[in-house]
Amino acid sequence: MVSKRQRVLLEVIQELINNNIRSRVYLFKSLFLLDKEYGLNIGFDFHPYKFGPYSIVIDREINKLIKNNYIRKEGNFYKVNKCGKLSNDSIKQIINKFKSQRQILEYVYENYPFFASRSEKIARKKEQIKKGLFDIGYEKKSIDLFISLLLINNINCLIDVRYNAFSMNFDYTKKKLKKYLNDRGVEYLHLKELGINGSLRKSLELEEDYKLLFKNYKKSLKYKQELLNIVISKSKEEGTAIMCFEKDNKFCHRGVIAKELTRQGIGVTAI
């Protein structure tokens, strides 16, 4: 059985084929506009990449559809093996709105300039490097939303302060995350020594448990100034973010790091 977003994906691919359009670029831009302008909330986030708005998750869903024989590769596009009747008129409207791939690209680039900021199709202006320090948690964030937040805040270096750079969401495992970021011009650093060993987190239940853990962690930071200096140095060179899991930094040791760096005169902005 296909999910709601897989169903929409199938229908968009089929409607493109019906209109003799076989273009991945057109596919991604159509899905982007369905979300932004037609309110078709299908659970995809986007970030700026080589040809405008792109989604890692969409490509993953396409691969699932291929694996389950709903679609198959045909040249540079796809052939639909299984698809029901078109269930949303918005899909037909968005595809019929543009006469060519160039037209839909120009429309997206003009109306959503942030998503065109990394495009290979337009000349990129040399931007002044923006410096500063941020903190971010990836909890409940798709990898596409996470990357988008980094780029919109002009972050060029991500410092991972997890003890173990592993996640049940495999997009945030060290190897994958580093590749995603490097491909988009963002440096990745893993400062394991600024993390907290997972064994110390096992019994955390109450707010008091967190307070005790972070109280002890704060004491340990006086022995880790060399590592903090790396963070400080990076933030003075370019936009830099420290990252861990928790959405709210009050429940994450990166919040303790942020407070310590603020005490040392380095402002930290939470994303």
Predicted regions and their residues:
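Internal catalytic-core helix/loop-beta-alpha segment
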Residues: L206-A241, F251
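Acidic, metal-coordinating catalytic cores used for nucleic-acid/nucleotide bond scission
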Residues: K50-Y54, N164-K174, G195-N197, E246-H253
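Short Gly/Thr/Asp-enriched flexible loops that form oxyanion-binding sites at enzyme active sites
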Residues: F251-T262
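Domain-edge interaction signal
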Residues: M1-E139, I152, T262-R263, G267
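A conditional alpha-helix N-cap/helix-loop micro-motif detector
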Residues: E139-I143, F170, S220-L228
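Short, surface-exposed acidic-centric catalytic microdomains
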Residues: M168-E208
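Acidic beta-strand-to-loop metal/phosphate-binding motif
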Residues: C157-N164, G239-K247
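A short beta-strand-loop structural module common to alpha/beta enzyme folds
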Residues: C157-S167, H190-L194, A270-I271
